[in-house]
Amino acid sequence: HNQQARMRNLLVKKQIYIDMKPLSQKLRKTGLSLLWGITVWLFWRIVYPGHLQYHEQYQLFLFDMEYWKERIAIPGGMADYISEFLVQFYYHTWMGATMLALLFIGLQLLTWKLAKRQGTPEVYYPLSFLPAIAVWHFMCDENAMLSFVVALLMTLVANYFYTFLHTKWKRAMYVLVCFPVLLWMAGATHLIFMGWIIISELHTCFKKRKFLQGIGIVVGMFALKATCTLLISIQIQNPIYQLSGFLGYYRFPAVIPRMEMTIILLFTVLPYLLARLPRTHKHVSVYMALQSMALVAISYPYILSSCNFDKEEAMAVSYTHLRAHETRGNLV
């Protein structure tokens, strides 16, 4: 009887452990995302607030219908408009830092959700921070615009909805409607959507050995891209490379930083790459901790390498003088 009682107790404890395992994994993931958001907030609020003030100082935003029409008249205009609205909150750096923290959390969570939809094991959750870390590196450039982050979020949301469509006709209709809308609203990040569709459909077709169908989908996507670009060129007289939406992500439209294309590529392929990593159900917390420490060790010097603290100091001084001048003017 004592042996049977011990066996029952062991079975109960094992069942409790099995039931608690998903909860503990969820808590670990939530904790990592919250820690990520807090780190981003502290950086922009304490370490790099001058860059937020610089953006707010040299931007004019109007709640005006004519201004809205002017902004959305170009590819990526909606992302530009939304980002310019959000930049107004940079006037108070704590609000600007909060905005950025929320946006960066959104980038990481959407990356993970897309990877999870491809079957990525929970153990690789820390690796979903990689694209967002690259965006952080890029945003330390004072000429990098917030519209890039907004456009990335738009595109990742479009990708996520696509993963729930299981019939080819629904997917085809979704692409035909969403692709031109996304190109116009988000700009060049539509290339992530395009790449996601191509990789997803090729994977499905090759798994079913429908090679010609896969090639046809690739040709169709490039034809859709060319058609949309041609229609845009009729309305907007800009170079072809700008008609893909590379207009509002950087302060100088004629410049397309390599980092933009690197980030676009990273968001496109990483969810699929994570799903191809080896599966393991043992020592999950240990592996997650090791990945997290490796990310910190790599990202810390990586982020610092993109910071220019001389410019940061100059921007902070300039902003302080500007506000002091405005205060004296108001007193007079």
Residue ranges and their predicted role:
Residues 57, 72-76, 96, 100, ...:
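Membrane-interface micro-motifs in multi-pass membrane enzymes
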Residues 320-327:
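Conserved small/polar residues in nucleotide/adenosyl-binding loops
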Residues 166-180, 211-215:
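Short hydrophobic alpha-helices at membrane interfaces in multi-pass membrane enzymes
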Residues 214-276:
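Membrane-embedded alpha-helical segments of integral membrane proteins
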Residues 280-319:
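Hydrophobic alpha-helical transmembrane segments in integral membrane proteins
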Residues 29-52, 220-229, 294-302:
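Transmembrane signal-anchor helices characteristic of membrane glycosylation enzymes that use polyprenol
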Residues 14-40, 275-286:
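Start-transfer (signal-anchor) and selected internal transmembrane alpha helices
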Residues 43-103:
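Membrane-interface coil-to-helix junctions
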